């Protein structure tokens, strides 16, 4: 699971948890709780150097300082993109811990680990989402645009549509992180 820890404000950690006690926590402070943040996590368990197996970018800058680092073993088989339930905006196994925020776009690539520049770019000194349609999504990859009326619809071409639970189309907003950033 990938999650933002908010034990206080500013948010105090961004965490990756995997099976077998894997836990990596980065500690960038997210001071503006109303601002747009772009998170990118790349996982490649085939890497021989443990710190290269999970990488994290916040707003286009790689974060390398960790408060906790229990890395997975090389070639570890993780739950993401396996036959397990995937949840977005909710802490797995704890339905009372839900995201209190907005998501503009979510891309999950299967079999490819890449940095933030595949998903976002700077326009007029503002980080905005890029169209990921040219990326290789792999078999289990997904692109969720969270568009009104189709919040769980997959736009990757894989038809990996997510089932909504306790959410309706009226939970969407027409505002986007790219509003006003130019084209």
Would you name each region that the model predicts?
Residues 11, 36-38, 51-53, 85, ...:
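Extracellular structured ligand-interaction cores
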Residues 77-103:
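Extracellular glycan-interaction patches encoded by glycine-rich segments
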Residues 15-17, 57-59, 89, 104, ...:
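Predominantly extracellular/luminal cell-surface or secreted proteins
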Residues 32-33, 79-82, 99, 135-138:
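Extracellular/periplasmic catalytic domains that process cell-envelope and extracellular macromolecules
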Residues 3-74, 171-183:
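Extracellular glycan-interaction surfaces
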Residues 22-31, 92-95, 129-135:
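Short surface loop/edge beta-strand patches of beta-sandwich-type extracellular domains
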Residues 48-50, 67-68, 102-159, 164-182:
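Extended recognition patches within non-cytosolic domains
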């Amino acid at each position: 699971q990938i999650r933002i820890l908010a034990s206080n404000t500013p948010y105090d950690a961004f965490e990756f948890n995997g099976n077998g006690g894997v836990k990596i926590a980065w500690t960038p402070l997210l001071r503006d709780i109303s601002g747009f943040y772009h998170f990118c996590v790349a996982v490649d368990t085939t890497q021989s150097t443990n710190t290269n197996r999970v990488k994290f970018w916040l707003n286009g800058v790689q974060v390398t300082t960790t408060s906790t680092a229990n890395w997975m073993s090389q070639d570890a088989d993780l739950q993401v993109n396996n036959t397990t339930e995937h949840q977005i905006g909710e802490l797995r196994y704890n339905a009372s811990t839900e995201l209190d925020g907005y998501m503009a776009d979510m891309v999950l690539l299967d079999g490819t680990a890449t940095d933030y520049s595949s998903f976002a770019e700077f326009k007029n000194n503002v980080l905005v989402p890029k169209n990921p349609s040219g990326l290789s999504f792999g078999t289990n990859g997904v692109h969720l645009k969270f568009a009104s009326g189709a919040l769980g619809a997959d736009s990757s071409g894989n038809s990996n549509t997510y089932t909504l639970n306790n959410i309706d189309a009226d939970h969407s907003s027409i505002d986007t992180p790219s509003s006003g950033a130019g084209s």
